[in-house]
């Protein structure tokens, strides 16, 4: 079973991602954080959160969130040797080239527009990459 950390402030998008995993029978244990700060708390075991162990095998990350956005979180994540190798898959409503370039320089594994919902027969690059990361 794969451990997945979903960093997403929208409950609808969280539920949609969960349904997509179930639809494709992707065995997973989903952990959620509602912003980058909460995600770091989970990874580091700070501010009363128990450290998430084992570490997630993949992080699904929204870019636009309150308190600490996805780029700020990704910058801190990549600065830590303990977390630098965790694959990060961006899920966002932003299709701006500047966001894509910023995330590429921080070593993301993939970028997909929301919602993270795949239909049977979907052959998109995002679906193939996500399946590769989660299997």
Predicted regions located by residue number:
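Conserved acidic segment of CheY-like receiver
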Residues: 2-22, 59
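His-Asp phosphorelay/catalytic-motif detector in bacterial-type signaling
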Residues: 26, 54-57, 82-87
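Acidic, metal-coordinating helix/loop segments flanking the phosphotransfer/catalytic sites
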Residues: 32-58, 121-122
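Active-site residues of response regulator receiver
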Residues: 62, 92
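Receiver (REC) domain active-site loop signature in two-component systems and cognate sites
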Residues: 65
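Negatively charged, flexible loop motifs adjacent to catalytic sites
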Residues: 94-98
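Short, glycine/charged-rich "phosphate-handling" switch motifs in NTP-dependent
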Residues: 109
